[in-house]
């Protein structure tokens, strides 16, 4: 890592990369994060934790080691994300430069991506990783009535093509205006997506 940081500072072949580099995410495996002090390197490059953010005290612990940021992911916990955002804002009042990044973990079309977008917006972030649509084709096997209901309620966020409702990505951006509604970023009520009449037998297996 030391060699990489020095190369970013001195290698002319890396000038364009260095000029565009915002931060280096999770430079070590989660289990090794706490074994290395990055304060000497962090004067020129910002480092953030991602996978190592596995507890409510992870960000403050990482701060001591020179990390300046932490990722926000719904799957890691809404309240943890809010707490870390408050921490960064508090520390920055002292003239420091800590931040939250918006990362993804395959948030699917529907509530998952909508609520994560709302969380990102709450933090005031304009750039976010979105990769769920790379792994699952829109609403995929979701019942057509349900997918259509989401499309009708959030027509700025979704579009329909080739018979499938998908996230509407235009020039690298997605619209979020329709998410500003009561109900945590969803304009639908449970009954709006149609009745669920399928019956499933639940069997208990005792070993």
Where are these regions (language model features)?
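Catalytic core of soluble alpha/beta enzymes
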Residues: 1-111
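Flexible C-terminal active-site loop/helix
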Residues: 94-99, 103-207
